[in-house]
Design a protein with these regions (language model features):
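Conserved beta-loop-beta/alpha segment of the NTase-like Rossmann-fold superfamily
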Residues: 1-68, 106, 112-118
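Catalytic core of tubulin tyrosine ligase-like
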Residues: 60-179
Length: 179
């Protein structure tokens, strides 16, 4: 997606990646968090969203917040996969951890730079796939039918593990919405 968006709109175009299965009813709080994320993304950050925990939860991943970058925005110290109950309780008590919402915001150029740094082969394969794919002609919709013969060559890897947990450019917006 970052490759296509960069081609169409330039490397400073901002992408917002949201899971389809999240229900966020407080749209004004979501909009505020997105505005904060867009501002951070414009400075070259890969931004993730965290939700302030209401209880120890072993079914969610956590983000440890580091130094503040702006109100409710922090440099990320580390990501922690689903902890046990006692560790989750310790996280809540520390006040430094928030739930990982699995939502992202970044410029196309920053993401492409990080993919190129951590996964150069994947970036080259993705560019090959995009070049071989069918691009729709409707000027109002940028539909791409990915080429299956080149797509299957790209490793199936999570953005969390491949980029977010390795990059030094990660920031988190501590969102105030429930999800």
């Amino acid at each position: 997606a970052a490759n296509r968006v960069s081609t169409l709109f330039g490397p400073d175009a901002v992408l917002l990646i949201l899971p389809a299965d999240h229900l966020i009813e407080d749209q004004s709080s979501l909009a505020e968090s997105v505005e904060q994320a867009v501002s951070l993304a414009a400075t070259g950050k890969l931004v993730t969203f965290g939700v302030v925990p209401t209880k120890p939860e072993t079914g969610f991943g956590y983000i440890e917040c580091d130094t503040p970058l702006a109100p409710d925005c922090f440099k990320v110290r580390r990501f922690v996969e689903k902890p046990d109950q006692q560790t989750a309780q310790n996280f809540i008590e520390s006040g430094r951890y928030i739930w990982n919402a699995g939502m992202f915001c970044f410029t196309a150029g920053t993401m492409l730079d990080e993919i190129g740094h951590f996964l150069p082969d994947t970036l080259n394969l993705a560019r090959d796939c995009l070049a071989a794919s069918h691009h729709g002609t409707d000027p109002d919709h940028h539909v791409v039918q990915l080429d299956a013969s080149t797509l299957h060559k790209i490793a199936d890897t999570s953005i969390d593990y491949a980029i977010m947990e390795k990059s030094e450019k990660i920031a988190v917006v501590s969102a105030r919405f429930d999800w």
